[in-house]
């Protein structure tokens, strides 16, 4: 053989596949990206958003506070109004009762005044009767006034009423009221059963007794009920 290759002893390693050449792996350097700072416009926008959010939350809080305050005021006013209404309704019976008591007390005072006056009158008349020994009489002027009052009540009498007086009063009554009695159709008569100063009127409807004895009994009855 005419090859010019040098001769080399064969070994078993010659059958193994050739080993690859070791090449170190170089990892790529990490790219560090620095975060860029926000621009002025972004900062302003962020501030606006924060201000808007704060204003929104503040508005909600203020609205809640105002609503709570208004509700409290309305509730207080309603409570006061209801309390006043209940107080008035509770005081109404008490007020009515007090008015009734005042009215009854005034009626009692009026009645007491009347009783005192009647008792004083009864005592005075009784004292006069004890002194003079008979029922005190009134003068003719009182009798004339009494008859004039009876004449004013003429519509109460029909027909020809008859006026009776004590004989001692007959002449004076005739002189003072004779013409008036005749004008009204009244007849004047003397009645010795009457006390001086008293009179009676007799008509179709009945008698009207204004005698001194009758008035005396009435005064005593008012002064001491149940005694006379």
Swiss-Prot record:
Transmembrane segments: none annotated. The keyword Cytoplasm applies. GO terms for biological process: bacterial-type flagellum organization; bacterial-type flagellum-dependent cell motility; chemotaxis; protein secretion by the type III secretion system. It holds the Pfam family FliH. It comes from the Bacteria. Keywords: Bacterial flagellum biogenesis, Bacterial flagellum protein export, Cytoplasm, Protein transport, Transport. Its main location: cytoplasm. It is found in: Cytoplasm. GO terms for cellular component: bacterial-type flagellum; bacterial-type flagellum secretion apparatus; cytosol; type III protein secretion system complex. One of its GO terms (molecular function) is cytoskeletal motor activity. The keyword Cytoplasm applies. Needed for flagellar regrowth and assembly. Belongs to the FliH family. PANTHER family: FLAGELLAR ASSEMBLY PROTEIN FLIH, YOP PROTEINS TRANSLOCATION PROTEIN L. This is Flagellar assembly protein FliH. The lineage of its organism: Bacteria, Pseudomonadati, Pseudomonadota, Gammaproteobacteria, Enterobacterales. The gene is fliH.
């Amino acid at each position: 053989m005419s090859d010019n290759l040098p001769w080399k002893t064969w070994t078993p390693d010659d059958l193994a596949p050739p080993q690859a050449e070791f090449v170190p792996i170089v990892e790529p350097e990490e790219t560090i990206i620095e975060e860029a700072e926000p621009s002025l416009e972004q900062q302003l926008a962020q501030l606006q958003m924060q201000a808007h959010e704060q204003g929104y939350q503040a508005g909600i809080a203020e609205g809640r506070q105002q609503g709570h305050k208004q509700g409290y005021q309305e509730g207080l006013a309603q409570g006061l109004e209801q309390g006043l209404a209940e107080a008035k309704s509770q005081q109404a019976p008490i007020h009515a009762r007090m008015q009734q008591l005042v009215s009854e007390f005034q009626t009692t005072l009026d009645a007491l005044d009347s009783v005192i006056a009647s008792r004083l009158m009864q005592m005075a008349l009784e004292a006069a009767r004890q002194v003079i020994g008979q029922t005190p009489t009134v003068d003719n002027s009182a009798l004339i006034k009494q008859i004039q009052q009876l004449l004013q009540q003429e519509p109460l009498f029909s027909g020809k009423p008859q006026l009776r007086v004590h004989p001692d009063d007959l002449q004076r009554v005739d002189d003072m009221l004779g013409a008036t009695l005749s004008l009204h159709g009244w007849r004047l008569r003397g009645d010795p059963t009457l006390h001086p100063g008293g009179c009676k009127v007799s008509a179709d409807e009945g008698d009207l007794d204004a005698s001194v004895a009758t008035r005396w009994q009435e005064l005593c009855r008012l002064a001491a009920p149940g005694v006379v």
